[in-house]
């Protein structure tokens, strides 16, 4: 069924690309790196899959997993950037696990926790941080094939460090404990010594980034909420900016792709840089974007080279590149070497 759907979408998108390529930069070319000879790391990122027990949502994710599995050059990793489930329930995690297990989307799979994943309730209908940790670590371990025993952890792929942050509360905004903040600083210090870019994965972006708080609003949450890290945001931002070539990859706010020239139109950019710190915000995979490029089934493919990082917008569900929303980011380590 997925093959049939993909075939139909491929035909439709081929026609669409001819009509709209000059407007949106749609390109239905090979799913492969720009330069296969020199690329060091390639990974797909998606956020906000919001799994329920719906087979329709499972089918939507299958479109993307199929696209990744059939990439001309196998991906080094697929990274889930939180809100993997809608409420952190066992049946939601089970469906997600079983859906992912049908495919081999990448050589590695990694997963961050999001606020929706922390809304697990006990038998009395009360929020349960204990069950949040139990369910997330269990299913993240089973889905990724890694031994994950905390809401935050570090992984390494092709010699590149991935640092995953996780909220330790059940609120919409994140709570990053002092212990986790200290751990983050230590992990960044170790990783920065390698002279390679470091990827910090957090469902929540930094307060004030990517158009926040104007691009965020949650009337159901009684707690003050900025759409970002919350009260610890400034401290986390300062730590991230202590080191060179740090890439923060987030989701959460369900904003669509924007290109470098569209900040004045939409009030935010999908990729923001300050010095050698770079913040990448992903659209929601499952839901239609609330602003920017209106679509779903999308995410960024990250390609790492010796001298740069390419951030490439892709519709995984339609197997199409959205080249208008691509970014190229030079690495400071390469610049230093060139001098």
Regions found by a protein language model. Give the residues of each.
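N-terminal active-site segment of His-dependent metallophosphoesterases
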Residues: 22-94
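Gram-positive cell-envelope targeting signals
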Residues: 1-26
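Extended active-site neighborhood of metal-dependent phosphoesterases/phosphodiesterases
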Residues: 90-194, 235-242, 258-287, 294-305, ...
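Active-site-proximal beta-strand elements of phosphoester/diester hydrolases
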Residues: 40-53, 159-169, 199-203, 277-284, ...
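Active-site neighborhood of phospho(di)ester-bond hydrolases with catalytic His/Asp-centered motifs
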Residues: 45-47, 78-83, 109-115, 165, ...
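A short C-terminal boundary segment appended to hydrolase-like catalytic domains
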Residues: 37, 292-293, 297-339
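Acidic/histidine-rich helix-loop elements
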Residues: 43-63, 85-88, 119-145, 171-174, ...
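Active-site-proximal segments of metal-dependent phosphoesterases and phosphodiesterases across multiple
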Residues: 175-177, 191-250
């Amino acid at each position: 069924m997925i093959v049939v759907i993909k075939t139909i979408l491929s035909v439709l998108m081929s026609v669409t690309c001819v009509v709209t390529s000059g407007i949106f930069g749609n390109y239905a070319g090979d799913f492969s790196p720009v330069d296969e000879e020199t690329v060091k790391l390639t990974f797909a990122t998606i956020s906000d899959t919001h799994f329920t027990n719906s087979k329709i949502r499972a089918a939507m994710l299958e479109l993307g997993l199929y696209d990744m599995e059939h990439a001309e050059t196998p991906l080094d990793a697929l990274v889930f950037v939180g809100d993997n489930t809608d409420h952190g329930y066992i049946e939601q995690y089970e469906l997600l696990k079983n859906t992912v297990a049908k495919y081999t989307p990448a050589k590695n799979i990694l997963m961050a926790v999001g606020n929706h994943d922390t809304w697990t309730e006990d038998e009395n209908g009360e929020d349960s941080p204990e069950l949040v940790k139990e369910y997330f670590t269990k299913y993240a371990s089973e889905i990724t094939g890694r031994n994950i025993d905390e809401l935050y952890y570090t992984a390494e792929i092709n010699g590149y460090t991935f640092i995953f942050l996780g909220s330790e509360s059940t609120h919409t905004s994140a709570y990053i404990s002092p212990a986790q903040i200290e751990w983050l600083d230590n992990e960044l210090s170790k990783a920065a010594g390698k002279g390679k870019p470091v990827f910090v994965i957090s469902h929540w972006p930094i307060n004030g980034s990517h158009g926040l708080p104007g691009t965020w609003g949650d009337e159901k949450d009684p707690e003050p909420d900025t759409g970002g890290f919350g009260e610890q945001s400034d401290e986390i931002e300062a730590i991230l900016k202590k080191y060179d070539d740090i890439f923060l990859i987030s989701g959460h706010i369900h904003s669509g792709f924007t290109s470098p020239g569209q900040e004045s139109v939409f009030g935010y950019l999908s990729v923001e840089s300050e010095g050698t710190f770079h913040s990448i915000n992903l659209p929601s995979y499952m839901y239609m974007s609330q602003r920017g490029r209106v679509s779903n089934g999308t995410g960024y493919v990250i390609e790492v080279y010796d001298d740069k990082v390419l951030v490439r917008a892709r519709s995984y569900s339609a197997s199409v590149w959205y080249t208008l929303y691509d970014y190229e980011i030079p690495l400071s380590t390469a610049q230093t070497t060139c001098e």
